[in-house]
Each structure stands twice: as structure tokens, then as C-alpha cells.
Regions:
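Enzymes that bind and transform nitrogen-containing heteroaromatic metabolites
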Residues: 2-242
Length: 242
């Protein structure tokens, strides 16, 4: 029996799953190095092995990995009013891509992730927004079939407890893979919402400007539960000491 099997909280069990350089960086050109190819493949293998109900990323990570900077034309929706209420576009979805996009800036083109990797492909998109997002953007999301929830105030301050509660209650998400970037990882870590750490170590050192695993972290303790080599890359699994 795994830790998530006995997890009893009104939120998903959160696993922060990241590929990390030897000096603790999670973004940068090192991820495209030939020397790191086997470790990157190991990262995706572990992702599939976890078989989460959802994966979650911040706006910058989602933009770089999936929306590719697309900016939708919102002029057809200007002047429309939309009540600031949570919206479920697909009540039959069982696998989700959760985008923490406080201001509503991501340019999705449809309501599902198109990717050949089964760890990501066909995931239904759920936007986590703060209050005050433009109504024309909400209309656009509804038009293309993207779900959204509100969990934060108009100043852009995210209410992580509320977001996780809604993800569990509305969408039934029990196991959530948190996959960056460092700002979102740090927000989860500071609020003690990371139950498990899964780290695949890349055989390289990042550059000074590359981002760390956690941005503005707080002191916390984890216990090593498992370690092994996958494709020659070290995989370390830690659980939170509570």
C-alpha cells in the first residue's frame, strides 16, 4: 500500500515530480543536452508510472510546453458578461491538465492537451484563475471547452487551499503531479502541500540564470523512501515527514 492510498485530506495527494540538474536547477538549456537524453526519458517513464489523475504547471511552464505563446483573438467576446463562477466544460473527463494561470493569459486552442505521451495527451484543461479575469477570456474558454475555477483575489493572490479543495471536490482529482515551474513549486512547498518529492537527476550542472527546484522555499523535512537507477539516471523518491 502506498502513501496516497491512506491519504485522508480534502485535497489531492501532491507529488512534485521534476527533472533536476546536479546543482538543483529545473529549467535551462541542459534539458536539451544529448548527455541528458536518457535521464529526460527516465523522467517521462516515472511520470507514466505514477499514473496521476492530473498534472499541474504554472503559466510559464504551460506556455512553453503546450500553448507555445498563442494569443487568441478575444474581440468577438468583448462586451459579454460572465458571472465569476466555476465552470466545468466536460463532466466526463477523468484526466486533467491543471494550469495555474492567475490572470488568465494562456492561449489554449482547445480543451484537451494534444501530445503523444500518454502521461500528458488527452488531458482535459482546467484553468485556476483569480478573481478579476476579463469576462471575454472566460467566454473564450467556454467556447473552446476549457474548464476553470476561481481560487484567489483580484490582487492576484492565489488561495492554494481553495484551489486544491475545488480540484478534489469538483473534478475528483485524488493524485496530482506538480511539475513546475519553480515559482509554483515554491508556493506549494511554502504552504506544506507537497506530500511526496520525485526527482530524476540530470548528469550536468545548470547555468547561473536557470531556476531552482523551489523559488523562495521554507524549511521542511522529507524522508527517502526509494532510490534506483532508471536509464542510468538516479531517481529519488521522498515523502513528507508529518
Amino acid at each position: 500500500m502506498t502513501r496516497e492510498d491512506t491519504f485522508e485530506m480534502p485535497r489531492p495527494y501532491v507529488i512534485c515530480h521534476m527533472g533536476m540538474s546536479l546543482d538543483g536547477k529545473v529549467t535551462g538549456d541542459f534539458l536539451s543536452l544529448t548527455q541528458c537524453a536518457a535521464a529526460v526519458d527516465a523522467y517521462y517513464q516515472v511520470n507514466r508510472r505514477y499514473a496521476g489523475d492530473a498534472f499541474a504547471c504554472g503559466r510559464v511552464t504551460m506556455e512553453g510546453s503546450f500553448t507555445q505563446g498563442f494569443q487568441p483573438d478575444l474581440t468577438p467576446y468583448q462586451g459579454r458578461t460572465v458571472p465569476p463562477m466555476d465552470y466545468v466544460a466536460d463532466e466526463t473527463a477523468t484526466f486533467f491538465a491543471v494550469a495555474f494561470d492567475r490572470r488568465g493569459r494562456l492561449g489554449w486552442q482547445c480543451g484537451r492537451i494534444e501530445d503523444e505521451d500518454p502521461g500528458y495527451g488527452n488531458a482535459h484543461v482546467v484553468e485556476v484563475l483569480c478573481e478579476g479575469v476579463a469576462p471575454e477570456y472566460l467566454c473564450y474558454l467556454q467556447h473552446i471547452g476549457v474548464s476553470y475555477i476561481f481560487a484567489g483575489n483580484e490582487a492576484g493572490v492565489l488561495d492554494l487551499d481553495l484551489a486544491l479543495f475545488k480540484l478534489r471536490r469538483i473534478f475528483g482529482i485524488k493524485k496530482l503531479l506538480l511539475e513546475g515551474g519553480s515559482i509554483l513549486n515554491g508556493a506549494f512547498q511554502r504552504e506544506d502541500k507537497i506530500d511526496e518529492l520525485s526527482l530524476v537527476i540530470m548528469p550536468c550542472v545548470g547555468e547561473e540564470q536557470d531556476k531552482p527546484l523551489f523559488w523562495q522555499s521554507a524549511l521542511s523535512e522529507y524522508q527517502l523512501e526509494e532510490s534506483r537507477l532508471i536509464n542510468g539516471a538516479p531517481w529519488l523518491r521522498y515523502v513528507r515527514k508529518r
